[in-house]
Amino acid sequence: MPTPKKGARLGGSASHQKKILSNLAASLFEHGAIKTTDAKAKALRPYAEKLITKAKSGSVADRRNVLALVPNKEIVAYLFNELAPKFENRPGGYTRIIKLENRKGDNAPMSQISLVLEETVSTEASRATRAAASKKAAEEAQTEEAETEEVVEAPAEETATEEAAEEK
């Protein structure tokens, strides 16, 4: 992996940044969610998502590449055997960053980065719910129109009866 060039370095040197990201990714995969600073969470997100994408393929070469980046065999085994199948139907967006309150000691902006393990809603299911919702809305609109027509007609009839009474 080449030296990171984009943005500020975490920890000062490139090697320290690599170790920080490696340890953060290992903790994220182990616990499912971690609290860290905004900068570290934003740097960790693409790093972790690339590792998960490699784990989804499941090849031996990808396993060795991930082991080179996260040198913890138990966590890599968990990533490939347990987590990767959960993300099989998800094309990306495996992590979520939630902003938290600033840290008490130094007022650093904090975030929680977590794995998104919820099932994705298929497009067919979302289409079905949208169609059902639109049918329901159309029925409600028709009933409202019928009610407004009745209300509009009622005063017209009253005025006609009043006019007839005035003529007599």
Swiss-Prot record:
Residues 124-168 are annotated as: Disordered. GO terms for cellular component: cytosolic large ribosomal subunit. InterPro entries: Ribosomal_bL17 (IPR000456), Ribosomal_bL17_CS (IPR047859), Ribosomal_bL17_sf (IPR036373). GO terms for biological process: translation. GO terms for molecular function: structural constituent of ribosome. The keyword Transcription regulation does not apply. Gene3D superfamilies: Ribosomal protein L17. Residues 141-168 have a biased composition (Acidic residues). Keywords: Ribonucleoprotein, Ribosomal protein. The keyword Kinase does not apply. Residues 124-135 have a biased composition (Low complexity). Disulfide bonds: none annotated. Belongs to the bacterial ribosomal protein bL17 family. NCBIfam families: L17. Part of the 50S ribosomal subunit. Contacts protein L32. This is Large ribosomal subunit protein bL17.
